[in-house]
């Protein structure tokens, strides 16, 4: 069942198939199937209310996520899943998923999967990681500054998700920044492959 659920979550998030089950479930906000079955069973047997069962499920999921070995970058951005899972707005897309999973146009990922020989950033010769791309690379300063001006604070690993969850405007600003950066990187990667 978990395999089927993972496939569905990969489709929902437009994630690459290399993203771990644990990470893609958090990114999509879909409770893992085994925990969901326990939740539904408890409600069906009238042991708890739906709200109580959901609270227990999120607690179990959080404990599992905190101990998870895979999805380290996602866990760094999203250490606490409850606010993310319970949000009332904000959709993810392929580019946001790349940024949240670390599986996308990043030198460290492309080298790991054998698509390039180095982890070096194409724009500044630093090691290209999701953190570098989103928060440090000078190539994306304009997009970062625009988003930071809109949300009223400097963005970093420790506050990216918190900022997105503040309100719809912040979500849209950060999501737009991520999408523009990642979309440009994907287009640049295609051009590099043609050369």
Q: Each PLM stretch: what is its role?
A:
Residues 4-5, 20-95:
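Extended C-terminal regions of large enzymes
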Residues 84-195:
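Family-specific functional microsites
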Residues 1-2, 17, 89, 114:
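Active-site-proximal structural scaffolding
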Residues 10-17:
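Charged/polar positions within long, soluble alpha-helices
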Residues 1-9:
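Short amphipathic alpha-helical coiled-coil/interface segments
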Residues 13, 49, 59, 82, ...:
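Residues marking helix boundaries in flexible regions
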């Amino acid at each position: 069942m978990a395999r089927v659920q993972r496939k569905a979550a990969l489709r929902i998030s437009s994630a690459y198939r290399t993203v771990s089950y644990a990470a893609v479930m958090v990114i999509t906000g879909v409770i893992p199937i085994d925990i969901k079955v326990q939740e539904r069973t408890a409600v069906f047997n009238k042991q708890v209310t739906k709200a109580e069962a959901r609270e227990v499920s999120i607690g179990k999921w959080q404990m599992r996520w905190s101990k998870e070995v895979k999805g380290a970058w996602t866990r760094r951005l999203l250490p606490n899943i409850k606010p993310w899972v319970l949000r009332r707005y904000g959709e993810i897309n392929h580019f946001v998923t790349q940024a949240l999973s670390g599986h996308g146009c990043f030198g460290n990922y492309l080298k790991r999967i054998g698509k390039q020989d180095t982890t070096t950033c194409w724009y500044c010769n630093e090691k290209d990681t999701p953190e570098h791309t989103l928060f440090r690379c000078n190539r994306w300063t304009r997009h970062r500054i625009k988003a930071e001006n809109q949300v009223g604070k400097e963005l970093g690993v420790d506050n990216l998700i918190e900022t997105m969850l503040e309100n719809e405007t912040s979500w849209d600003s950060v999501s737009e920044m991520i999408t523009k950066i990642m979309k440009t990187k994907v287009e640049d990667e295609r051009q590099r492959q043609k050369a």
